[in-house]
Every structure is written in C-alpha cells, then in structure tokens.
Amino acid sequence: MNNDERISKPMSWVTTWGTAEENFIATPEGMPRPLEDTTVRQIVRVTTSGDKMKLRLSNRYGKSDVVIRSMHVAKQVKADQSAIDMSTDTAVKASGSEEILIPAGEVIETDPLDFRVKALDNIAISMYFGAAPSAADQMTGHRGARATTYQVSGNQVATEIFSSPATTTSWYFLADVSLMSPAGSKAVICFGDSITDGFGTDWAVPGKRPDTYTRWGDFFAERLQANEGTKHISVVNKGIGANSILGSWPTDSGRDRFKRDLLGHDGVGYCILLFGVNDLLSLSDTGKYDRLIPEYQKMVALCHENGIKIYGAPILPFGKSQDHTEAAEEVRTRINAWMRSPESHMDGIIDFESALADPEDPKSILPKYAPLDGLHPYDGYETMAEVIDLTMFA
C-alpha cells in the first residue's frame, strides 16, 4: 500500500511515542522537588507525522490521586532548552475539563486535540500540579528519559521559557502519545532492558549528555522516516534499565509487564525483543535456560494471538563484563541458538549480536562499542539500527 492509498482509507489511532512505566523506588535521589503547585515541562520526540493527538497519563503505582490543574502541549524550540514555540501552545483536556484527575492505580486518556506534528519533532508537555504524590515508591514514570525535564514554581504551562528551572532526566506520569494515522500505519514495540533504554547516552558516561536522541530506537526511527516505504511506522521504546525477564527489581519483571507494554498502546503491529542479559549476569549454573525459554515462548504466543509480528534479537555478547561467567555464556549461546531456530516461531531475526561481536573474541562486544563496561554498547547504537532490515516493516 503506497502513501496515497493509505491516506484515502479510514484512519486510526497509532502510538507515536511511549515509555515503559515504572515506579521510582530504585532512584529516589532522582526525584524533582515536591510537585504540588509547580509546573513540570517534559520533552518527548514523536516518530511519525499527524495533526490530531491524544495522550495517556499513568498513575499506575500511585496510592493517591494525581491532580493536574492545567496541561498544555507545544513544540519545543531547541532540544536542550525549556523554550516552546508559542504559536503551537495548546491546552489539553480530559473528559472536557482542563483540570485532569488521574485516580490512584489507573491510566487515563486525554481528549483528542488538534495538534500538527512532523515525524521527529520534539514536543513539550507542561503540567501544573495540584495534589500529587512525592514518595518515590508512589510515583509513576520512567527514570531513564535521556531527555531533560524542567520544573518551576506556580502555573507556568503557557510560559515561553522557564527561568532557572530545576531539572531531571526522567518522565513523570506520561505513558504515551498517539496520532490519528493513515490506514496501514503501525507501531513497533522495542521491548528490553537498559540497552534498549539507551544507557550511556546521557550523564552516566563521561562526555555524553541527554537530549541527543541516540538510543538505537532513535536511530531506527530516523531510518524508518528516511525511507518512503516505512514512514507510516512508529517506534515505541519499552526498555527499562536493570530490568530482567524473571526478576522484579527495580520494577515489574519483563514477563509481568510484557502484556500491558505490548497491548496497552494503539496500532501495534510489530515487536522487537532484545531481552535477557540481566537474567544471566553473575550466573553460577545453567538452570535458567529452562526457566527463560518458556517465558520467551509466552511472549511469541501473545504476539501471534494478537496479530503482531515478533522479531527476536539474540542476546548480545558480554564477555568483557565483570559479571560474565562461563555458565552465563553457555545459557546465552543456547538461548540464541533456540531463538534462531524454527522452534522459536519468531517471525524473523534482527542480528545485533553479529554486528557488535568482536571477530577475535565472539563472546565479547567490540571494545569500541562498549568501552565503559563491556556490556552496554552505547557507542554501537547507530550500528544496531543500521543492521535492521526495513523491509520487515514495509
């Protein structure tokens, strides 16, 4: 289906940006000042184009209601600044009201609004808070935004540029942004851990900084938009740092959050699964293989039951990591062999492993890609995106 044919057919909602919800119990030092009577401006990058938008707001981990007294969306002027394009500043409502209530434990949708964006635009979402939790274990958001969030006192949702704001690099109460999209448009869920979440693309690594959009998913989105046949495909990053398939720290385990992260968005057509390395760190025996394979099988089955194609990405080598063991290497090798086999029922393989492995030491990532710890290939994220076959999404 070409673009003209898509536009002529009925349109539907498709998620253009999203993040993996978690609580902040692991990093309470990363919290902003108390939220009540402050404005928080958060920056997200949409991955497709459209002119009608809605947002999902989440209080999934909250034990009390969140009250947003006023909320606006606008285009950001420059990637590392709080300034907005005032000609685009638009109020956001839910159920017809400018004051938005997010009940404890719930996720809500805003009303649709007219707001034109181009793919890869940065938008600023400004929230003026009334009641809001401040305890880390009751806050819903995402620690590793890799983008700057700005906080100032009072109601400044329509202020062009903040003066001396407090800053963090996390998102708060945002779940996703969807656009009314042409027929055939689909979202890709990138499901994983810190490698998908983009560890190493901000202050965690000397010389790096946030607001650069250099996660592998960011480069992938840019490639999709540069190719005429895939401009209708959006990218939704569902990576969480330190997350594992079986373990429930620092937030819900991969197996527990997969269904909601897959099906909780609009228009999902694909899933890229790069997950499991944290389950193997410091492994002393090979028994985890028999525990992990059934979880992968459940993920594949859930995708297929819902008409979603799932592409497996074999677990990356980490032989130069301090947490590498021979048992871990054996399990990694066996999992990857299973994933590549017909028995896995994957719809295809995205071979990040071969692209990053050291030819002289295949159990390790090339040092130039993961110089800090041999585990996170933050200097190889662009290489990862380049090996993805775009015809898998055309």
Each PLM stretch: what is its role?
Residues 296-304:
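Surface-exposed amphipathic alpha-helices with a cationic face
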Residues 17, 36-37, 41, 65, ...:
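Conserved SGNH/GDSL esterase-like catalytic core that processes O-acyl groups on lipids
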